[in-house]
Amino acid sequence: MKLSKSLEDSLKKDELSNLAVNIGEVGIDAILDNGVLRDTPITSSIFGGINAIGSVRDALFTKKLVSFLSELSDIPVEQRRSMIDSIDNSDDYKVKVGEKLIYIIEKAEDHYTSKVIAIFFSELLVGEITYNQFLKISRIIDSMFIGDF
């Protein structure tokens, strides 16, 4: 799956700090026109589809992805690579990190929920929680009312 590989590539790059824009104050059009997003593997893959299809759903998904990725910018790139590679190389998990994150982020209600999920993914990356705990927390967040945050 090309999209999940693009997400993993984005997570393993150092440019996540460039995504730290105030998503709440920026419209979807402004997000997609930003050159930084075009240079990020995952968003450039989606952006190509948006241009071809013009899908609002894809644009909203991109906004959730940008919100998720921008939350991870403080985690050192080597730490991100190490954790993702260890999960991907484990026999315990059948779905690679990138693909699983696509499923999780796609199900997120909005970009704010995606940001909350990213906070817990950060905890996974620094070793504060396990991958299974992250997956359980993500499922709980998915079923919560956004006003509960």
Spell out what each predicted region is:
Residues 4-14, 89-101, 128-135:
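Charged, low-complexity, helix/coiled-coil-prone segments
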Residues 4-67:
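Membrane-inserting effector segments that mediate pore formation, membrane fusion
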Residues 35, 54, 76, 145-148:
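Flexible interhelical turns and helix-capping residues at alpha-helix boundaries
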Residues 44-121:
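Eukaryotic partner-binding/assembly regions in large regulatory complexes
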Residues 103, 107, 111-149:
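Long, helix-rich, hydrophobic modules that act as membrane-proximal anchors or helical bundle/coiled-coil regulators
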